[in-house]
């Protein structure tokens, strides 16, 4: 049983279960997580596509954090409505090289393009949102803003 058994992140049961899954997954790899998501009524995209965003960002963050020294294993993930926008922020640390070809990130799991971040980008663009990726020396940060209809 993970520590998140029963953690209530939001009122949406599907999204809450997904967040619990990733929190447990991170916990098993001794990755510290700070997850604050308000996903109650006004989701900026259909629930299934919201789960694509959350799942891909958290899975990438967990995969990048696993090989790090324990004190650097930390993920911060936030999602909330601010005015007419829904904002998502994902921050994690990483080691090694982040490869890109043009605008596309290359996968660290296999040769070729990374599908996860591209899937997130497609959902964000489909709903007229904006996504920025800031790659620092050790820190990887994704910021998303999607208008709420």
Annotate each PLM feature:
Residues 7-11, 33-53:
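Conserved short strand/loop->alpha-helix "switch" segment adjacent to the catalytic nucleotide/phosphoryl-transfer site
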Residues 11-29:
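Short beta-to-alpha transition helix within the HATPase_c
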Residues 47-70:
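Conserved ATP-binding N-box helix of the HATPase_c
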Residues 72-84:
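Short beta-strand/loop element within the Bergerat-fold HATPase_c
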Residues 84-114:
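Glycine-rich/acidic phosphate-handling loop/turn and adjacent ATP-lid/helix
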Residues 96, 136-143:
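Glycine-rich nucleotide-binding loop
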Residues 128-138:
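Glycine-rich ATP-binding loops of the HATPase_c
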């Amino acid at each position: 049983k993970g520590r998140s058994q029963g953690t209530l992140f939001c009122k949406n049961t599907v999204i809450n279960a997904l967040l619990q899954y990733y929190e447990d997954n991170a916990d098993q790899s001794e990755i510290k997580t700070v997850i604050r998501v308000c996903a109650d009524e006004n989701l900026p995209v259909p629930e299934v596509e919201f789960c694509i965003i959350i799942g891909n960002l958290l899975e990438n963050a967990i995969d990048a954090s696993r090989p790090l020294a324990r004190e650097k294993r930390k993920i911060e993930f936030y999602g909330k409505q601010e005015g007419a926008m829904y904002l998502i922020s994902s921050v994690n640390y990483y080691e090694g090289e982040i490869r890109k070809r043009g605008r596309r990130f290359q996968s660290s799991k296999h040769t070729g393009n990374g599908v996860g971040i591209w899937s997130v980008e497609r959902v964000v663009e489909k709903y007229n949102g904006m996504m920025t990726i800031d790659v620092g020396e050790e820190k990887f940060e994704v910021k998303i803003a999607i208008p709420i209809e």
